[in-house]
């Protein structure tokens, strides 16, 4: 930037298998979520194969990405952003978190901690930047006026409003069930020693901390020259053990 600040312009995505880089992509997207599907498709296309498993960290967990994995029969070992928080005992003790409230699916109604009904009001659909549609059911309590716990429950002048995405809740439940397996827990732990090592080695040992070329294509070429070297170093390390 002209003011001397350095800000990230490209998001590098790396796919690994047994500590070897098997594919990479360069994206202008600042967040990882929307790079997941195109990166996965690109790597599979280049290798001419279809993956049975896809392992990624919580930055990639989204409704759209989970749908893609399920539709393509890929077992996704992917946490979502609030996974760690939701799987702690303290989360269940959060009285005013609507996910801990009683919900009557038949009546389409929540019951708040004070026993007041929070009925269904309407359904809204939102489109994200990639064009994916998310559907929410809106619930609103009409008895918040005078409630002694209102300040703890909501800051809205209209009372407590809940946006329920039933599909997302189902997906999160599946992720929790999947990651309760020791087999998948082990695979998830392995991920951190694979992809993170690529960036750690590149920055720490090779001293590569910024690109010298400009433009997505040239940045891809520069990163592409680094990755075979990384894999070659891995091969030498294995041969010497």
Segments from the language model and where they lie:
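Anion-binding and metal-coordination hotspots
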Residues: 1-241
